[in-house]
């Protein structure tokens, strides 16, 4: 999907890790939400409250889910899921343009 139609977008940016991750929240008519943003190159750890589906629009990264030892590489057009009440490590090697869907 190239765009979201009939949504609301929160104007205030979500800024994390001293500006290394910046996103905006998108609210859908059915009550679900997502964030649309960028993560700049570097290594970060994110904690999750609810399950997440991460779609990579462009860029490159490696991800290691909590409790796993292996890293998996992701690039444009790929996605990965993260369980709720968990965390994941991400190493961004090329600025990441992403959509994170909260389930």
Curated annotation (Swiss-Prot):
The keyword Transferase applies. GO terms for cellular component: cytosol. Its EC number is 2.4.2.1, 2.4.2.2. One of its GO terms (molecular function) is purine-nucleoside phosphorylase activity. Gene3D superfamilies: Jelly Rolls. It catalyses: a purine D-ribonucleoside + phosphate = a purine nucleobase + alpha-D-ribose 1-phosphate; adenosine + phosphate = alpha-D-ribose 1-phosphate + adenine; cytidine + phosphate = cytosine + alpha-D-ribose 1-phosphate; guanosine + phosphate = alpha-D-ribose 1-phosphate + guanine. Keywords: Glycosyltransferase, Transferase. InterPro entries: Ppnp (IPR009664), RmlC-like_jellyroll (IPR014710), RmlC_Cupin_sf (IPR011051). It holds the Pfam family Ppnp. Catalyzes the phosphorolysis of diverse nucleosides, yielding D-ribose 1-phosphate and the respective free bases. Can use uridine, adenosine, guanosine, cytidine, thymidine, inosine and xanthosine as substrates. Also catalyzes the reverse reactions. PANTHER family: PYRIMIDINE/PURINE NUCLEOSIDE PHOSPHORYLASE, PYRIMIDINE_PURINE NUCLEOSIDE PHOSPHORYLASE. Belongs to the nucleoside phosphorylase PpnP family. This is Pyrimidine/purine nucleoside phosphorylase. It comes from Methylobacillus flagellatus (strain ATCC 51484 / DSM 6875 / VKM B-1610 / KT).
């Amino acid at each position: 999907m190239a765009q979201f139609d009939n949504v609301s977008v929160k104007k205030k940016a979500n800024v994390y890790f001293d500006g290394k991750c910046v996103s905006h929240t998108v609210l859908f008519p059915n009550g679900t939400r997502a964030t649309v943003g960028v993560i700049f190159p570097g290594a970060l750890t994110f904690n999750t409250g609810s399950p997440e589906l991460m779609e990579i629009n462009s860029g490159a990264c490696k991800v290691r889910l909590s409790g796993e030892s292996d890293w998996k590489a992701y690039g444009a057009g790929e996605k990965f899921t993260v369980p709720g009440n968990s965390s994941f490590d991400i190493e961004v090697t090329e600025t990441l343009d992403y959509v994170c869907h909260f389930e």
